Swiss-Prot record:
Keyword Ligase: yes
Keyword Protein biosynthesis: yes
Gene Ontology CC: cytoplasm
Reactions that this protein is recorded to catalyse: L-glutamyl-tRNA(Gln) + L-glutamine + ATP + H2O = L-glutaminyl-tRNA(Gln) + L-glutamate + ADP + phosphate + H(+)
Top-rank taxon: Archaea
Coiled-coil regions listed: none
Name of the protein in its database record: Glutamyl-tRNA(Gln) amidotransferase subunit E
GO molecular function, one term: aminoacyl-tRNA ligase activity
Family assignment from sequence similarity: Belongs to the GatB/GatE family. GatE subfamily.
Species for this entry: Thermococcus gammatolerans (strain DSM 15229 / JCM 11827 / EJ3)
Enzyme class (EC, first level): ligase
Quaternary assembly: Heterodimer of GatD and GatE.
Amino acid sequence: MTEKFDYKELGLKVGLEIHRQLDTKKLFSPVPSELTEKVDFTFERRLRPTMSELGEIDPAALEEFKKGRKYIYEGNYELSDLVYMDEEPPRGPDREALEVTLQIAYLLNAKPVDEVHFMRKIVIDGSNVSGFQRTAIIALDGKVDTPWGSVGIPTICLEEDACRIVERKEKEVIYRLDRLGIPLVEISTTPDIHHPEQAKVVAKYIGDALRATRKVKRGLGTIRQDLNVSIKGGARVEIKGVQELDMIPLIIEREVERQLNLLKIRDELRERGVRPEDIKEEFYDVTDVFENTESKIIARTIKKGGNVLAVKLPKFRGLIGREIQPGRRLGTEMADRAKKYVKGIFHIDELPNYGITEKEVNAVIEKLGLGELDAFVLVAADEETAKKALREVIKRAREAIEGVPEETRRALPDGNTQYMRPLPGKARMYPETDIPSIFIPPEEKERIKANLPELPQERVERYVKEYRIDKSLAETLVNDERDELFEELVKKGVKPSLAASILVVVLKGLKKEVPIENITDDHIREAFQLYTEGKIAKEAFEEIFKELALHPEKSAAQVAEEKGLTLLSEEEVERIIDEVVQQNIEVIKAKGMGAMGMIMGRAMAKLRGRADGKLVSTLVRRKIQELS
């Protein structure tokens, strides 16, 4: 397969940051680390940034503060105590969380520190009530070997997760406290990844090490993968929230494409002779041009007493509409910046459109005194809001002349990315004074190192050898994190081949029909218990799981009863087979054992899920032989 880019020539550098929730108690309070929809109380806060010890303010924190938002927190008495309301000093940290992180460190060839010191990382988007996140380095200097070469893991950290967002409004954000404080392991690599597929290999290896502990949470939102991507002449861009492993190569490829196109735009702007200082912060009121406009957005704004303001972007015509990622343009980047104040912008390269006529476009060009290569951007809002939005556009336009801006971006489902905020600075960390340093005795390190869990690939090989199941089944069990449940079922007497087949083949087969994520491990345990007690046939699993996926509040026993899936006695099975045989007696007399397939099919149509297939086959064979 031909690659889209020569990544070596482009000097691609990628670093990973992987965050995974640990399945222990909360990090600084002995409350369960679970999520809930039950809300017992609410309170509100406003947050502001503080200077670091060097008198600096983190730019990302400052930008968040400028939004002037109020934060409302929803809490539950069982899952949120005074520690996470920031009304009481932290306790802990949780020893199990610390031990699991040390296991992960050894699995990734890292060296644990002798003493753990927690720090405070400034976060004032409201996701931490205190305005900071507690984090500590647990190990240093790990590595992952890949076919492309080794990738370093400079740090493995243990930190607390943030609140869960419920609703975001213009001047108010509602958070739920339940997720705040769940232990989170953060693993950072060096930027020694030079190919998109290499990034996927490294992420998978780290994910395997995490899952090997069997103490990480599963499900949506429990793992977050961030990428740091740069190319020669470009800039370091942090891409947050990559959910799927398979999306990593595409997201990197799209970021390379974006940076290359931004560099081409930079070169063209320089050829046109434009400099950042040529873009003036001058706002033109062009409301009169749109007095009788057909644009619904603009007409609605003017009717409310708003304005239409414009800025002039010298020598930008034809470049704002230039595609930089599939379906995204430089104008999209400008709009992303402006969206903290307005819903969108209009620019010359996309007009006439959206109800704006050519006559109106020409009137704006004339009013601004634009030359042939000059562009404009419009915003419809109240005057102050419009100016704030256009200042963001001006800032992004100036950055376009410089090349690729350093920033934090959000991963989108299609592989593209979207602006989130400036890249965080270093002025956001300071010591945590409420938690004493924690000494890790050498004997504790040795104990953990001597009892490391097996890695997923080792587990796959063991399953094939010990349980004699197909390798692809074993790999799917491990990759889908059903391996622990599989071993539990086998210990209870379920045949390994049946347990693996139900957990992999049956559940995967239902994925396109029903939401199988609603089927819990307890549902599965109960269904297998019914089977081992002889109450259901193995053919009943599919029907039971299908119903449980749609109605997870039900039990497996309840579904089996409602759907008539409980096993019939041997006498009842024989009676139904006798009926089928009598209905087809002439065919049996004519074909003898040649009628076996037909009779078996008709019998199973009546008995599927209510009788064991082997028993039905034995009885049908006997009945046919008696008549032949």
